[in-house]
């Protein structure tokens, strides 16, 4: 048993408190009009309070809304093929390889992404928000760092719209392998480099845009290192955050001398892009 899938059959308007409760143990979520799915690694399962989840669901009128099942690594492709379809995010269309390519009449930049055990498909609001804010900020020739790259979707997207080079880093070796496969699928091996590790493995240079779509706790822990990787005038893009966490994150980033430049919200989630002063 590698991962546990929790399915909460509740409408989107009721997702927020459960997202907050499962934010730390879960490594990813899938939301749609009828349910919320959370994916928790087996080693984090002890942090999930099933009794509290069931009590809260019952209090909200959903006593039978929770189902739990273990997932083996080999089952993930079937899981995603059953649930994924092309998703538009800003100028991008994120499309799994199990789905036929879109019509040539669509002017979107197509990203062919298969997630396997990683997250970052465009089916979660945090990825869509990050893709939109990235597209608005990226300039041709930029150097991009994607921390917690997952599927590699942000690094790949950056190269597809003009970045000179993008580096994705992730502490999960399965994510690193998956991201490298997606880089090959999108024919971006000359532009995207994927490495195992955290932001420290990218300490040899500075970047024009640093992106991190991870949890609030990890973002706060990594904040000094993320800011240190920014070139003068660069942008810091943070996603993976619930709306109530906005002010805490904004204040933490401001303490490093960066100002909120743009923000977006969707389905209870928030993302912000911060600008570093052009002067050292």
From Swiss-Prot:
Alphabetized GO MF terms: protein-lysine N-methyltransferase activity
Sorted UniProt keywords: Cytoplasm, Methyltransferase, S-adenosyl-L-methionine, Transferase
One GO cellular component term of this record is: cytoplasm
Give its localization.
Answer: Cytoplasm
Recorded catalytic activity of this chain's protein: L-lysyl-[protein] + 3 S-adenosyl-L-methionine = N(6),N(6),N(6)-trimethyl-L-lysyl-[protein] + 3 S-adenosyl-L-homocysteine + 3 H(+)
Which amino acids does the record list as binding S-adenosyl-L-methionine? 127, 148, 170, 213
Pfam families from the UniProt entry: PrmA (PF06325)
NCBIfam families under this entry?
PRK00517.2-2
Purpose of the protein:
Methylates ribosomal protein L11.
What this protein is called in its record is Ribosomal protein L11 methyltransferase
């Amino acid at each position: 048993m590698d991962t546990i899938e929790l399915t909460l059959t509740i409408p989107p308007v009721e997702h927020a408190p459960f997202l907050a409760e499962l934010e730390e143990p879960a490594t990813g979520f899938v939301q749609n009009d009828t349910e919320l799915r959370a994916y928790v690694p087996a080693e984090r399962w002890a942090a999930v309070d099933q009794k509290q989840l069931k009590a809260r669901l019952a209090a909200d009128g959903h006593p039978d809304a929770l189902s739990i099942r273990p997932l083996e690594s080999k089952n993930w492709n079937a899981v995603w093929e059953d649930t994924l379809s092309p998703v538009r995010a800003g100028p991008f269309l994120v499309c799994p390889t199990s789905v036929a390519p879109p019509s040539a009449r669509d002017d979107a930049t197509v990203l062919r992404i298969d997630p396997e055990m990683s997250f970052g498909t465009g089916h979660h609001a945090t990825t869509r928000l990050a893709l939109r804010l990235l597209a608005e900020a990226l300039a041709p020739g930029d150097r991009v760092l994607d921390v917690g790259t997952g599927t590699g979707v942000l690094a790949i997207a950056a190269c597809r719209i003009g970045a000179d080079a993008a580096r994705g880093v992730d502490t999960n070796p399965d994510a690193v392998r998956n991201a490298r496969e997606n880089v090959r699928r999108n024919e971006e091996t000359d532009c995207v480099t994927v490495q195992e590790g955290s932001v420290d493995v990218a300490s040899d240079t500075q970047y024009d845009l640093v992106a991190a779509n991870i949890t609030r706790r990890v973002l706060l822990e990594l904040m000094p290192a993320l800011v240190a990787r920014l070139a003068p005038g660069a942008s810091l893009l943070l996603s993976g955050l619930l709306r109530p966490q906005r002010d805490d994150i904004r204040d933490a980033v401001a303490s490093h001398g960066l100002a909120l430049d743009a923000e977006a919200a969707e389905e209870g989630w928030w993302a912000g892009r911060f600008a570093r002063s052009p002067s050292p």
